């Protein structure tokens, strides 16, 4: 008995041979023989047949075939983004950024997320938005800084009373449990503030130091770290010192921050050139593409919602895509292949535009797939969800990956609550196994898409999520059932890793792609939609102001779109983030500042054109909010105040106005930074 075999490797190389089988035992008229084949590499296509011969004759089996592959490919995308926080009306670059989040997340997330992945045999994708990278450039090249950084740099002895109050009000903006309480001195300062005790000048200087130190990633707080640029970040010495800092210490700590800012793009570029990661992009200022193309295409299905005056500017959407491509090419030395549309928002028109602009793939949410086609796709079935689709296009088709919503949200919202990170990882892997792997049918390749925020989650994890991520990457790289891939790697193939190509023309088409995003607006009909950014009075007022500014720009401007301050201000105002916080479906506890910055960008359009800005831009879109909670009840509000009743659980509110009848209103779930339901509220 012998086995004749042939192996075709992923790179096309062939080898063949015949292996004699050894007799094992007889069982009545049957005999058992054993022939060892292999070893095989991932991606090998193996065919074989068995021949047996005896004095009585010969027997030949049919040819059998199999391919060596994992049970599941996993394409993982970490999305990193911040809106344009720079006030275009600021007279000086120093302090021109109204919020410090670009700088602070760079200390914890933007460099370290890529560096951490590089320590493991995993291939992942990082989405860096152009507007985020633009702001990092501002800090590094144009002398820009934020208000918090200016408060940090100012000697504690020279802080005015107003500056002291600003510092005490904002320098505890960190996760209490994971960023404040674990540091003894920072916790002392926090408790001192909660008691209302006076802060001495040394206390203020310690607070200047600790607010910043708490945002450095865990690895930087525990040891000196050499960066890919050759510089070394060393703030662990300050963590060890705990208190009694000098002003020179504070300035030295600030200098360490700029080392990390300088290393963000070089780290990603080096890892991408080494084939370890893929860097994707987003339309330039993070707009909701389908709404820029035509707001009238959005489904308005929340009770009380309505459409704003029509805003239909596909040319503006195209400009965001063009700028994203050119910005990417400048930074990374190649054209981008992949796109994460802002908020995963897509429509048939938007995807057609993405393909025409030269992108090879994009990703969105499973909820979009569920609403696509004539009757919807069964996105809950892994055989349906775990594959890329090809858009049906008259111009250039594009591959579309649909993320698994529940598995992605588990990492974003749930696993930070686990005290044991390894238990959290095992729970995730068990969910992948039972929800996906065990339910797959056939021998086709399957790819699970995971997409989530790559920065905001980690404040809710112990040690900035580092133990969780290390355990996750170790398990994914060591478990033969799984193989992590970048999106382009899955489509193009990678012979070195045994991954065969999955060309566009071989993908199943997705028919009648639905309009939607990765968010189902609270209070609307079931299913993902665009309602978070349109339909409520505040959102519609913003769209009206945006339309007026664009009309003025079209009338006055003569320069190339995107090449002058007026266009930059308009595109910044078209970003999704302002509309996210308008209305009652999401809340930041700082909506008024987002409102003011949105209007500042629109004023920047008129200022750049030499035009007077409308008086409406000096009036707040968001009414003055007054929030009632059980912890902080409110007994009196002003005539122009807007009352919001907020709780941590669902329910109904019973209320009466004056001597009127008793009425009830349901408490609606509202999201936070990452769209998970954080609390429940009703606005009266």
Segments (PLM) and residue ranges:
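CE4/NodB-like, metal-dependent polysaccharide N-deacetylase domain
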Residues: 307-341, 433-451
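Hydrophobic faces of well-ordered beta-strands that scaffold small-molecule active sites
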Residues: 74-76, 124-126, 279-282, 337, ...
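Active-site and substrate-binding clefts of carbohydrate-active enzymes
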Residues: 71-238, 378-624
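Structured, charged N-terminal subsegments at the starts of enzyme catalytic cores
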Residues: 255-286, 295-296
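Glycan-association/targeting regions that enable binding to alpha-glucans and other polysaccharides
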Residues: 1-72, 607-684
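Short, solvent-exposed turn/loop segments enriched in Gly/Ser/Thr/Pro and often Arg
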Residues: 127-132, 283-286, 338-346, 488-491
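Short, surface-exposed basic-aromatic patches at helix termini and helix-loop junctions that form
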Residues: 273, 331-332, 348-363, 466-479
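Extended, Lys/Arg-enriched charged tracts that mediate electrostatic binding to polyanionic substrates
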Residues: 239-261, 265, 355, 367-369, ...
């Amino acid at each position: 008995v012998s086995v004749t075999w042939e192996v075709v490797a992923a790179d096309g190389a062939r080898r063949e041979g015949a292996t004699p089988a050894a007799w094992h035992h007889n069982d009545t008229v049957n005999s058992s023989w054993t022939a060892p084949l292999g070893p095989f590499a991932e991606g090998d296509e193996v065919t074989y047949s068995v021949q047996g011969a005896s004095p009585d004759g010969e027997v030949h089996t049919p040819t059998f075939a199999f391919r060596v592959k994992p049970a599941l490919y996993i394409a993982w995308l970490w999305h990193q983004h911040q809106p344009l926080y720079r006030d275009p009306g600021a007279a000086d670059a120093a302090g021109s950024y109204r919020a410090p989040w670009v700088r602070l997340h760079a200390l914890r997330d933007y460099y370290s997320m890529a560096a951490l992945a590089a320590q493991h045999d995993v291939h992942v994708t990082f989405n860096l938005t152009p507007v985020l990278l633009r702001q990092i450039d501002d800090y590094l090249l144009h002398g820009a800084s934020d208000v918090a950084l200016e408060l940090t740099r100012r000697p504690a002895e020279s802080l005015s009373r107003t500056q002291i109050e600003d510092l005490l009000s904002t320098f505890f903006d960190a996760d209490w449990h994971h960023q404040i309480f674990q540091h003894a001195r920072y916790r002392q300062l926090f408790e001192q503030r909660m008691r209302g005790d006076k802060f001495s000048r040394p206390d203020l200087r310690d607070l200047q130091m600790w607010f910043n130190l708490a945002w450095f990633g865990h690895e930087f707080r525990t040891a000196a770290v050499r960066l890919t640029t050759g510089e070394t970040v060393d703030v662990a010495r300050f963590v060890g010192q705990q208190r009694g800092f000098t002003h020179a210490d504070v300035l030295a700590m600030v200098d360490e921050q700029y080392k990390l800012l300088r290393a963000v793009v070089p780290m990603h570029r080096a890892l991408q050139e080494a084939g370890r990661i893929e860097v994707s992009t987003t339309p330039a200022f993070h707009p909701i593409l389908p709404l820029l193309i035509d707001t009238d295409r959005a489904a308005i299905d929340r009770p009380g919602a309505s459409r704003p005056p029509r805003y239909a500017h596909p040319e503006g959407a195209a400009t965001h895509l063009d700028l994203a491509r050119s910005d990417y090419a400048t930074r990374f030395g190649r054209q981008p292949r992949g796109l994460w549309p802002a908020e995963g928002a897509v429509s048939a028109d938007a995807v057609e535009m993405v393909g025409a602009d030269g992108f090879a793939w994009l990703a969105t949410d499973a909820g979009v797939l569920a609403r696509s086609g004539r009757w919807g796709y069964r996105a809950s079935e892994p055989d349906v969800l775990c594959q890329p689709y090809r858009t049906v296009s008259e111009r250039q088709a594009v591959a579309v990956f649909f993320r698994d919503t529940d598995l992605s949200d588990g990492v974003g919202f749930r696993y930070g609550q686990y005290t044991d990170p390894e238990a959290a990882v095992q729970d995730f892997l068990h969910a992948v196994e039972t929800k996906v792997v065990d339910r797959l049918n056939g021998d086709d390749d399957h790819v699970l898409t995971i997409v989530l925020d790559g920065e905001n989650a980690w404040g809710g994890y112990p040690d900035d999520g580092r133990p969780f991520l290390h355990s996750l990457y170790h398990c994914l790289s060591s478990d033969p059932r799984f193989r992590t891939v970048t999106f382009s790697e899955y489509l193009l193939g990678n012979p070195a890793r045994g991954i065969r190509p999955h060309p566009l023309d071989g993908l199943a088409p997705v028919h009648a792609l639905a309009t939607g995003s990765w968010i189902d607006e609270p209070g609307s009909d079931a299913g993902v939609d665009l309602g978070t950014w349109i339909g409520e009075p505040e959102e519609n007022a913003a769209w009206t102001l945006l339309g007026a500014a664009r009309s003025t720009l079209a009338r006055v401007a003569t320069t190339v779109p995107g090449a002058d301050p007026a266009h930059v201000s308009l595109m910044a105002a078209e970003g999704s983030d302002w509309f996210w916080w308008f209305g009652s479906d999401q809340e930041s506890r700082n909506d008024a500042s987002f409102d003011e910055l949105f209007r500042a960008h629109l004023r920047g359009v008129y200022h750049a054109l030499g035009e007077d800005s409308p008086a409406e831009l000096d009036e707040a879109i968001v009414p003055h909010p007054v929030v009632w909670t059980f912890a902080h009840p409110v007994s009196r509000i002003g005539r122009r105040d807007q009352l919001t009743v907020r709780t941590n659980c669902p329910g109904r509110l019973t209320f009466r106005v004056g001597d009127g009848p008793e009425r009830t209103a349901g408490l609606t779930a509202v999201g936070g930074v990452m769209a998970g339901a954080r609390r429940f509220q009703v606005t009266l």
